[in-house]
């Protein structure tokens, strides 16, 4: 549920092989940062945004959370019934806006006002990927393609490649 707060799960330990100090931020549910090309950290250096199935532990429904890195406290920011699609989320460098895809819809979440609004809806059988904000935060670019069930090593767009 939006606004639900979760207590810190942080723990610190030393890696046996390297001797490096490790800080584990979460220890329940499935949690992950945005896609590896997207920055999950806020410019303030105190906050990280992440996706989690927290509250839906028996499913793969992921919603947006933020964590205070000092205290470890987490707050749920969205409650999408079908969840946010992995790899289909981005934010502005200052973390004011976060855009994400759920059910072929693009939502815009304002981290300052907590307003969450639908800004684009598409029909079924379309793929929306690679969201990106313009530098002035006035535009969101994204890929929109017909879903033709093309696979990385097969399908109609990969004629001549080895089939599965």
Locations of regions flagged by a protein language model:
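Beta-strand-rich domains and repeat architectures in extracellular enzymes and scaffolds
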Residues: 2-10, 17-62
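Multi-bladed beta-propeller domains
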Residues: 11-33, 67-84, 111-127
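Short, flexible, glycine/charge-rich loop motifs used to bind or transfer phosphoryl groups or to couple energy/partner
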Residues: 12-13, 38, 55, 79, ...
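Acidic/polar residues at beta-strand termini and the immediately following turn/coil
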Residues: 15, 42, 56, 68, ...
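Low-complexity, flexible helical/coil segments
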Residues: 50, 58-64, 85-86, 139-142
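Beta-propeller blade signature
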Residues: 64-70, 161-164
């Amino acid at each position: 549920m939006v606004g639900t707060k979760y207590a810190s799960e942080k723990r610190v330990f030393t890696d046996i092989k390297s001797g490096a100090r490790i800080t584990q931020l979460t220890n329940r549910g499935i949690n992950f940062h945005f896609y590896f090309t997207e920055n999950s950290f806020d410019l303030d250096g105190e906050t990280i945004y992440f996706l989690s199935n927290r509250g839906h532990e028996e499913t793969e429904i992921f919603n947006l959370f933020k964590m205070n890195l000092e205290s470890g406290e987490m707050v749920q920011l969205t409650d999408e019934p079908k969840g946010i699609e992995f790899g289909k989320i981005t934010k502005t460098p200052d973390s004011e806006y976060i855009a994400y895809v759920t059910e072929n819809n693009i939502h815009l979440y304002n981290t300052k006002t907590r307003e969450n609004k639908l800004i684009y809806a598409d029909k079924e059988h379309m793929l929306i990927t690679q969201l990106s904000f313009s530098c002035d935060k006035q535009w969101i670019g994204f890929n929109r393609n017909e879903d033709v069930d093309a696979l990385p090593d097969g399908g109609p767009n990969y004629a001549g490649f080895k089939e599965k």
